């Protein structure tokens, strides 16, 4: 029965995204919600200017409807499900405001860094407040073992850091057609397996709902992309995957399963540090996916390579937790 629920969930998430996209994409185009391309980015990206953005709305809609329908039919809204939906919708709303300012108000930078950071922290603090209210464990466990450590009040700092950092890391990965959609689908699929292994079936249902929604979106986001998810989608996905890691006590394993997001972020950090300290850049451009573009790789080759890396890291993460 539960296996059928999981199958129905991913199919439903996929179909909602696929069927909604042909309606929603022309609507975004009529509103002239087109992506502006930075001049300092790769020149090959300039032809993408005007491609409809804010497609993350479709992903979030699919996730929300699919999750609520499946949970109401086969279970009930648990505290875990509430937290997952809250983070997804909260970070999605923050991303929506950022995108709206960019495309509707023609302010290419969107929200200021300070405004976005404050929003991310506020959502993370509310998440932890609810988390604490329901007395979820403040322990952190070493993957593949029963060894855990209670961080006490320090867990609050970890949660806020993970949600803010994780949402930004996923956001940085959304730079090529289909790159984030593919890597996210893989990562959420891995967490679905691990949540299922822990008998956290509501978290598993949510995870496959996200995977299905993102795969449906990928049909229209793969190269050449007909729509971008924007910060609306990337921040929502980032917050969601971190929340899943926290609720399944797989915070450490997130670094492996989400390894592509981690490496992308580290490439930006190292680039900034190197330039400020030595005046030289380590990469031709950061995040890392742009570096490979500028050394001559085709966009599709970069994307498939990163998908492959994400898949291998996901398999490694599952192996460590389940079979090691």
From Swiss-Prot:
Transmembrane segments: 5-25, 51-71, 77-97, 117-137, 147-167, 176-196, 203-223, 227-248, 302-322
Named cofactor requirement(s): Mg(2+)
Domain of life: Bacteria
Keywords: Cell cycle, Cell division, Cell membrane, Cell shape, Cell wall biogenesis/degradation, Magnesium, Membrane, Metal-binding, Peptidoglycan synthesis, Transferase, Transmembrane, Transmembrane helix
UniProt-annotated location(s): Cell membrane
Disulfide partners: none
Class of enzymatic activity (EC top level): transferase
The keyword DNA damage is assigned to this record: no
Membrane topology: Multi-pass membrane protein
PROSITE patterns noted in UniProt: MRAY_1 (PS01347), MRAY_2 (PS01348)
InterPro entries membership: Glycosyl_transferase_4, PNAcMuramoyl-5peptid_Trfase, PNAcMuramoyl-5peptid_Trfase_CS
A molecular function GO annotation: phospho-N-acetylmuramoyl-pentapeptide-transferase activity
Stored Pfam families: Glycos_transf_4, MraY_sig1
Family: Belongs to the glycosyltransferase 4 family. MraY subfamily.
HAMAP family named among the record's database cross-references: MraY (MF_00038)
Protein name (Swiss-Prot/TrEMBL): Phospho-N-acetylmuramoyl-pentapeptide-transferase
Naturally occurring in which organism (per UniProt): Bacillus pumilus (strain SAFR-032)
